[in-house]
Amino acid sequence: MRVVAAILYINVVVALICGLGIQGGALDLQDYPSVSFQGDAMQLQDYPSITFNLKGATWQTYRDFIEKLREIVTRGATTIAGTSIPVLNRVVPDSRRFVYVRLINLDGNVVTIAVDVTSLYVVAFSANNNGYFFSDSTETERTNLFVGIPRGDPLGFTGNYNSLENWAGADRGSIPLGPALLNKAIRNLRSNGRDSKAAKSLIVVIQMVSEAARFRRIEEQVRRSIADQDTFTPGSLMITMEKKWSKMSQQVERSVNDQGIFTGIFTRTVQLIDDNLQTLNIDNFNALSLHTMLAILLFRCRTTTSSHNTLPAASNIVLMGEDYVDKDDEKCTVGEPTRRISGRAGWCVDVKDGRDNDGNPIQVLSCGDGQERKQQWTFHRDGTIRSKLGKCMTAYGFKHGEYVMIYDCDTAIAGANKWVVSIDGTITNPISGLVLTAPRGATGTTLLVEKNVHAARQCWRVGDDVEPIVTKIVGFQEKCLEANYLENTNVSRYTKVFLDDCVLDRQQQRWALYSDGTIRADSDRSLRVTADGHRSLDSIIILACKGWGNQRWVFNTDGTILNPNAKLVMDVKDSDVSLLQIILHQSTGKPNQKWLTVTLPRTS
């Protein structure tokens, strides 16, 4: 029977060769790594396969490759409510557990890596017709991957970054990345899968594949290196992002409240380090997204709106470079974090004079240390927002224009002290549908509840770091958003916003993102990106601050930048950079409407 099975196997291979039109060449079995025998019968594990070929590679082909990998690993996954960010499936049947990623270098050398769809973890690879497994490989991996080809000697290291770095004799911060380094890594893995060169090569491969799929910021760095045919060395922000992916995922998933609304308020801070070695204490989703462009979440807990997978629990996942072991398929616990609320012009929501009497107004005031008692608020699961003074943020009534005060939580009018925090920055009273508003652009302004017109004066960020986030905004064809205003001149003469080649130190490409949803010129923060109207095809320009709806923007997780007042997105007109025109447009999902933030390190 084994002879018969072998003959059948040969026939299948011949059929595959003929079907693909391969003539006169030897078959490389790693092109068919899922062929296996069970008993006397041949089996085909139908794992999907994708390819990235460095020959003729462009940033566009790399972008498409990463997008396809994301699509495969998130099939059947749920998304976080109100976002487009998928959560990887906690468990999947073995028949869908892996994806093969074929990497081809300039010499035609092929290395195939196996990626676990539950973690984006590289778990094995094949090179030179041999399959290689890490020293901590599981039975599931050894049983299902690279069967039908010889097994190389077991690797002396695990797939964890700590083990790889030890074997490589170098840490990630000293190992360059880029197309030339990926080309070399494929060659090294092809020639020798077991030595220190292999460990170093795997560090390159893992970051340029798995980490780029997890974070659009890393994808963007690789894309730019391909476009420029250059290399880059991971900075401290990239490395801490890689280390904290699990913790990020946990905090995002625990930001869905008991009503299934994604507030984006973290229970615990995620600490990152920027490239100037300054600490970033990230305690809300908006800041996390702007700094990391997080694209995929690891399953950490079941959110209120997630479906529960009833398959048997998967084996514990030990993540690359992390000190966390994910154990439980448990429901997310929603905390009651205490944070500042900042909004118009970056000012903080403040209890006037720090007095705790019922009816005392709530205002906006400059944020300051030592003012925690009157500028910090606890977000309770019952929908109340409570001052450290012990009283609730309460609307005086349910009519447009009523003022907002602190009041005893138990004796306030029913529903007047309930609030819904939305990921777009709106804080709404669910009874009246009115939203928290700072009506005037001056400190000491008393807050009101008003009809939602999606104005900047109605946008808030919940988080203790109230400083604007300074960033470049990268758009179509890897070019940067730029304004052609000149300092110390009449700004009305220099109002155009357009795309140009990214230049690191060009001031006109630096933008400050404020808590009120405004995008401001970093060198003159009185100037805002403004929609010159509310209709499709209206231009986007620079104007002085007004607090209007046409000056508020939302960076969506799908890569669009939305003006919520017009319900239109930022668009490169006609996908033609040479027109030097950015406009409002209905969302189409096309590349000329996709944007990335590349945040800049803070000065010490």
Curated annotation (Swiss-Prot):
1-alpha repeat start and end residues: 345-387
SMART domains: RICIN
1-beta repeat positions: 389-429
Renumbered ranges of 2-gamma repeats: 566-599
Catalytic residues of the enzyme: 211
Family matches, as SUPFAM superfamilies: Ribosome inactivating proteins (RIP), Ricin B-like lectins
Glycosylation sites: 490
EC number(s) stated in the UniProt entry for this protein: 3.2.2.22
Expression sites (tissue/organ): Expressed in rhizome and abundantly in leaves (at protein level).
Signal sequence, start to end: 1-43
Entry's free-text remark on domains: The B-chain consists of six tandemly repeated subdomains. Only subdomains 1-alpha and 2-gamma possess a functional carbohydrate-binding site.
UniProt cross-references to PANTHER family, sorted A to Z: PTHR33453, RIBOSOME-INACTIVATING PROTEIN
Protein's job: Gal/GalNAc-specific agglutinin. Behaves as a type-2 ribosome-inactivating protein. Inhibits mammalian ribosomes. The A chain is responsible for inhibiting protein synthesis through the catalytic inactivation of 60S ribosomal subunits by removing adenine from position 4,324 of 28S rRNA. The B chain binds to cell receptors and probably facilitates the entry into the cell of the A chain; B chains are also responsible for cell agglutination (lectin activity). Involved in plant defense against insects. Has very low cytotoxic activity against the human tumor cell line Molt4, but higher against CEM.
Name assigned to this protein: Ribosome-inactivating protein PMRIPm
Species the sequence originates in: Polygonatum multiflorum (Solomon's seal)
Taxon lineage: Eukaryota, Viridiplantae, Streptophyta, Embryophyta, Tracheophyta
